[in-house]
Amino acid sequence: MSETKNIDEIAGRLSKDIFKHFLWTTHPKTDDNFECANEKHVGEGGKPKATHPGDVVFYYRDPYLGKTVYLHTDLKSYAKDTITSTRLRGAFKSLCMAIDCARCSDSWRAKYSVDDGEAHEVRGLLFVHNHDNGYDKPFYEAVDKVNLQALPVAPGTQLHYLGPHDIQRLYSIANDILRLKGEGELPSTYTFYYPDLVMTRRQGDVWDQSATIETLTAPYIIIKHRATEEQSAGYVIYYNAPASSPEEFEYFLDSLSRFQML
């Protein structure tokens, strides 16, 4: 097996190790292509694309939308010097075309076991792992240099991305969840907390809610758990904001009070 293949597999294993703790489901079919149905989609050299790649599909129920979100994911594993705007532009362009086809493709739905009658959305996720752990720049600066307006994003399409620092942070949280469960401080069953919003109410059972992709990049992640023989019911909160001013914490505490958590 080549070194490149080994590096690519690291990203696959890492993504599964992370997202299972956020209660995402991984479709068993991985590293598979599906048929391109748009003659306007062209690859390198201007040749029409025959297929689109699919590294892995994650999915979860969105409690605000009341539907299942499928994340057609492109797993990238780059060395620190190869995380460039040019390379990211190519990855985003490929993912844009893949999602454009996936959203209306019968073969994609059949491949990933999506019922035609199921309320769902298909989105793209670009997962960029730095395998030599040397990338110390803000990933968002590289993304900002990509001319997103020039990408072939179809109307209604949503793309998400996680960079090296996002992945390190989420891996750390996943390991902490694993540790808390192992030490009996967090029950094996838990849920991610979603308050009713002013314009949007949460739908479905409050328990076994997954962390949405928006939650994973939000200022904080809240886990809610029931009481056990050793532990009272409560919350675990992971904070993901700069923590640079007193006003920031005042707003955070006001939010917790508004959620009736204090």
Residue ranges of model-derived segments:
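Intrinsically disordered, low-complexity Ser/Thr/Pro/Gly-rich regulatory segments
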Residues: 1-54, 58-262
